From Swiss-Prot:
Gene: HBG
Assigned protein family: Belongs to the globin family.
Keywords: Heme, Iron, Metal-binding, Oxygen transport, Transport
Tissue: Red blood cells.
Protein name stated in the entry: Hemoglobin subunit gamma
Amino acid sequence: MSNFTAEDKAAITSLWGKVNVEDAGGETLGRLLVVYPWTQRFFDSFGSLSSPSAIMGNPKVKAHGVKVLTSLGEAIKNLDDLKGTFGQLSELHCDKLHVDPENFRLLGNVLVTVLAILHGKEFTPEVQASWQKMVAGVASALASRYH
């Protein structure tokens, strides 16, 4: 079951087709680590995260950001089954990595900010509403193993 209207799906997929996953992924994860520094504890193996410039210039941050957004691309292909799409990732983040599920919500909100920056006037309030709905759905799907 999906709460996404045809308009939501069109807004999400249309913008997604214009997203540069490398740029947006690195920017999104980097901003998460800068704005919410307690999230850095999950990335000890990434090397120096000692300052905003170290984080934003860190190739491991960028690479993982690409991985995150690539996974999001799979979600966009499966908007009607986000929980199924993220079942294994939810299990990994809950059982092995012990990530606080609130971090998924924070990451989604940072992504929306990055998309607004990168896509300017194209990121209308209607497009934002659809993307907020989608990132909330992804956060809920990723947190599903915790319940």
